Amino acid sequence: MHLVSKRDDEVTQAIDQCVATGYEAVILSFGSHLNMEDTSTQNSTRWKKLADYAHQKNILLGGYSLFSSRRISDEDDVIDAATGKPGGAFFGNAPCFGSKWGLAYRDKIKQFFAATGFDIWENDGPYPGDRCASRQHPGHSNWDDSQWKQMEIQKELYRWLNERGVYINAPDWYFLDGTHKIAIGYREVNFSLSREQQMILNRQNIHDGTIEKTPSMGWGFVPLTQYQGGGPEAVLEPLREHLPAYRQLMMQYYGAGVQACYRGPRLYDADTTRQMVAAVIAWYKKYRSILNADLLQLRRADGRDWDGWMHVDPSLPWKGFIMLFNPTDTAITRTIRLPLYYTGKKTTAIIKKEQGKAMSYRLARDYTIPFTFTLPAGGYSWYTVE
């Protein structure tokens, strides 16, 4: 859960809602009242108390902090070699990690995690690769070594966090430096679209974002409340009034093995909402091993016909897990050649629709089977391969 909070009691409420639904972590999202750069004893004590409360409930607690894409000062920002002045960064203005402010930022993050016991760091705007022409910054000599030195500063920070078991979310490809999860497809304006459009877009992002990554290497986004723009048709609040859309957005991401940012003040607003969320989480946890397995893209979503994917792992009891969607306004029946090579099945396979009746299939020489499915208008379904 990505919590938008203004008060400490909202954090404890979110932790309690996670316990009630089966969620395992809360991240204080951007726009919340968490400030990791505040090194006061009062701030550390406050957040340690909340982290301790979360840990007593077996919930992980994390928080958001922005490094890049903001202006600090003429002395600490990246200096453009062409002008000798701040500016010219990838995002216009950005701090230099080798500046006094940048080195202090690194130390403040370390101090916060050491003092509070937080489990997750959402490092938005990690170092984007800006070079800096300053000759006064203590962390680098000049333009020539600025990129290398800044990357080393960030890498050392990530290594320090990893040594302490801290999980790192960041939007850039820094896996070899210590990041654990990056965006699977993220454009802020897209989350002002209608819920129906977001469903299709999310499945397109899942398709594209799992070609070079395993599902758990990417995170998606579900705006429970307004984000950037968009009207009531773009958000899920009040949650109890949009249960089918809320459920499908969860099923799509969890069915892909992708953890999304469910961003808002709460996970449920009524007992019916709580029951739905808890049921989806229980479903995900039952099939978690196969849902985190490698994913084969069957057909990319385009809103015109069926789309879907299949997880595969021959070492598991469930060798495959299929998710299929029908975005059209009419029921459809399709027959496709389902590729089962990577399930490890060689002669026959058993497929069950939502753990219902078992159907036996004989594999062709190319390890495919003719698979016929029917989906209702705007519907979806899932199947296991055994």
Model feature map: region roles:
Residues 362-386:
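C-terminal beta-strand-rich structural cap/linker in extracellular carbohydrate-active enzymes
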Residues 1-8, 29-44, 87-106, 138-150, ...:
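The substrate-binding groove and active-site-proximal loops of carbohydrate-active enzymes
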Residues 47-59, 146-166:
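Alpha-helix-loop-beta-strand connector modules within alpha/beta enzyme cores
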Residues 1-77, 260-305, 313-320, 327-334, ...:
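Conserved structural scaffold segments of CAZyme catalytic domains across common CAZy folds
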Residues 153-358, 372-374:
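Active-site-proximal substrate-binding groove within the catalytic cores of carbohydrate-active enzymes
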Residues 7, 45-52, 56, 60-118, ...:
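Active-site-adjacent "subsite" loops/lids of carbohydrate-active enzymes
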Residues 19, 113-114, 254:
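Non-catalytic positions within long, well-ordered alpha-helices that form the structural scaffold/packing
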Residues 24-33, 105, 109-140, 169:
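Short acidic catalytic loops
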